């Protein structure tokens, strides 16, 4: 029997079920994450999260906030059942229940334009000119994929409905 894992990609916000071959150690997890150095953190008493240990780096365009962890998580995340040692097993938690613990985040730049009343020490600036860019962090729930269809769309309560 094949084991499955849940894979979260903060770039796309997709949280989906993927097959993981039995008896092959952590190699499939490294492959799913696309990295060579992996960190493991506890999801709950029965599950573990694997992530790229170097995922928080200069130039990231997306990251994940995990409710039970004090800092953002960079890169893809794999959720499995077990304590991180081998063997690992398919999660016993539903993907929908796991998803509520994550927020996919990305920085967004909002333009700030000059108003009619704005002036500088060197003189008047024309209204409508770009004055600044403000940075904010957009947080979105993961978009669930169960391997067959978009779970949110099927339930009628997600971003794609």
UniProtKB/Swiss-Prot annotation:
Keywords: Plasmid. Pfam families: DUF3846 (PF12957). PROSITE patterns: PROKAR_LIPOPROTEIN. To R.leguminosarum PsiB. This is Uncharacterized protein y4iR.
């Amino acid at each position: 029997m094949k084991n499955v894992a849940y894979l979260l990609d903060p770039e796309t916000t997709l949280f989906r079920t993927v097959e993981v071959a039995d008896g092959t150690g952590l190699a499939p997890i490294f492959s799913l994450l696309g990295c060579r150095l992996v960190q493991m953190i506890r999801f709950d008493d029965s599950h573990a999260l694997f992530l790229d240990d170097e995922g928080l780096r200069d130039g990231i365009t997306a990251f994940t906030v995990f409710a039970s962890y004090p800092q953002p998580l960079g890169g893809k995340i794999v959720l499995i059942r077990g304590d991180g040692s081998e063997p690992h097993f398919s999660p016993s938690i539903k993907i929908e229940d796991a998803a509520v613990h994550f927020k996919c985040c990305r920085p967004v730049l909002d333009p700030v334009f000059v108003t009619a009343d704005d002036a500088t020490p060197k003189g008047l600036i024309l209204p409508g000119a770009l004055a600044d860019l403000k940075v904010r962090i957009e947080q979105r729930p993961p978009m669930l994929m169960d391997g067959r269809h978009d779970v949110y769309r099927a339930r009628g309560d997600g971003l794609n409905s």
